[in-house]
């Protein structure tokens, strides 16, 4: 008996708290070593080069995304290793634009990075299944058509004029420097909420982020993308009691939850207003027919109206991705053009010539007038779209058994692997744009029409193939009239950028110059 007690005592001594912690730590270390050895020497992607830590853990991508240098590191890795690199244990990043049709084809499946399970109802941007995406696209694509958007030009003009008046009174007259990117976001959100549901929120009037929507959307994007990089962990967490905190719901007061709450309020207010007779139901062709009413009128092939969750998901897209894209393009144009005196001079000479010749409607030129009379300005816009795409992030697809065979660097890519391109990187393909691929050169978009078609074919700014971004026409119609009007009314100094501040001055009419 004493011998048994002695043996038990020695056994218990082994299982002390410190020893248990040490054993668990050893298991973790052993698992990490196993994972490194497997991913580096036995995984199907072992043949592809890339940053070491990216090849063995998804934490590399999440960490550098949060840090803000992931894009730069990937671009440098491509320059070092070649056009196909490994950026996660199961993902390849492709910088060869000629391979886009093989990656973004009609039957491609979005990778699990998109976390469609994070939303109660998946909007058009996160539907993974190609058949479901195609069916959804057929339902809502007419809403975003160019003809429908051009009909709303008077609304765009109204917001552009109010925006310029505000800049004049707040900054030009008082000789105060401004952060243009912030105000571009205000204009964008007011315009999009008016186009979307006739309810501008007053960002420009209040000179503030109304309801924190801009901040919350960008915070939501940070959380969404970080979770996407770590999708195995996120998907596991949704099987635990934490699920109710991870699924985006209007009740949440953080990130996308705030945007979803606002989308829900927009829909419910419209339904109440129609029921109570406070507004008349607009019909297609009316000046008051907006995106929201178009969604509410949309029917499925079975003749059913879209349910509230689906409509709310599309309003969410308008409030978030739709509004934020325009502000980034406007800021890029100002930065690129004002820092190049020769380019700026050509843009202004072109605008002045068209204005003096009476080619522009007043007070804001029409989209068609700009496309007809400002070829160099449009070339600048094309170059902005190329070098500063709104979605400068990965757009991964998952290889499935139904996909055509994909061979990269001489190796067949197996099922389950993720393959991605990045618009910022793909639009700098030296094989397409030559030695000046990283240089802002609007003249590349002038001249040979076949060359221009070639560039457009190999661009990823607005997506590719069956998932071409429907909202791009809204961004183009917002950006195109706003910039010439801004340049003709108010100007900033032509300079090399040292900070975000811009000094504005009221411009005299063209006839007085």
Curated annotation (Swiss-Prot):
Annotated heme binding sites: 477
Glycosylated sites: 308
InterPro entries: Cyt_P450, Cyt_P450_sf, Cytochrome_P450_monoxygenase
Enzymatic reactions: quiannulatene + 3 reduced [NADPH--hemoprotein reductase] + 3 O2 = quiannulatate + 3 oxidized [NADPH--hemoprotein reductase] + 4 H2O + 4 H(+)
GO BP annotation list: secondary metabolite biosynthetic process; terpenoid biosynthetic process
Origin superkingdom: Eukaryota
Function: Cytochrome P450 monooxygenase; part of the gene cluster that mediates the biosynthesis of the pentacyclic sesterterpene quiannulatic acid. The first step of the pathway is performed by the sesterterpene synthase (QS) that possesses both prenyl transferase and terpene cyclase activity, converting isopentenyl diphosphate and dimethylallyl diphosphate into geranylfarnesyl diphosphate (GFPP) and further converting GFPP into quiannulatene via an unprecedented cyclization mode which involves three rounds of hydride shifts and two successive C-C bond migrations to construct the 5-6-5-5-5 fused ring.
PANTHER family with a match to the protein in the record: CYTOCHROME P450, P450, PUTATIVE (EUROFUNG)-RELATED
Protein name as it appears in the record: Quiannulatic acid synthase
Organism of origin: Emericella variicolor
